[in-house]
């Protein structure tokens, strides 16, 4: 579809990363594609004309700043995540895409020529993705795997350069700092509020609590109401087949509150730790 319209796209993560040796074999539940932000709407419209539908998303963009649009099709077993930016890369989307595009290459996959990130950029994408939840065993394992690969192939300088051109230095610091020579003298920038909140959101509800704490008093009441009584899109975004009858919604509200209350002690601990690190 993108080729027929002359729209620049490249595929991230997924089977291509496995073929490159950047990731251990795993089953992909969706397809991740990065599109030229200037032509995002054009690509989405073309997909909709071919039977793809936007997946419901939480309308609270303050808590969950959008970085992609997910579409699904009744005749396809997977979704497509159409990225127009990538969390951790703070450069303006259109400028960032140009830096990314010059670091892509073409491979043959499933009988098609596909554009994918070059090796260093592929590592950067995977590392940033894993750093969103670095305490999860699977993410920790992926970071260790990528670290060993980067050391073995001497990718640290290339990664440092890419992180600099995409303004990802602050986000990727925990991964990259261990790869650089101890003699390297470097001033690391501060991570954005969005990235700090994303990484700190370990427990159910923590992202909303953090967003409300950082919001202005003018919008706090509206955000609090949305957290207490979320719209149907919140449930459908997690499970597109969720029961939206009155009884079904009540069950989901009850389960949501139960998860939040169980996580409350850990949430308070994480908030205290975040406050201490910011002092």
Model-predicted segments: where are they?
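Conserved NTP-donor binding/palm subdomain of two-metal-ion nucleotidyltransferases/polymerases, i.e.
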Residues: 1-29, 35-279
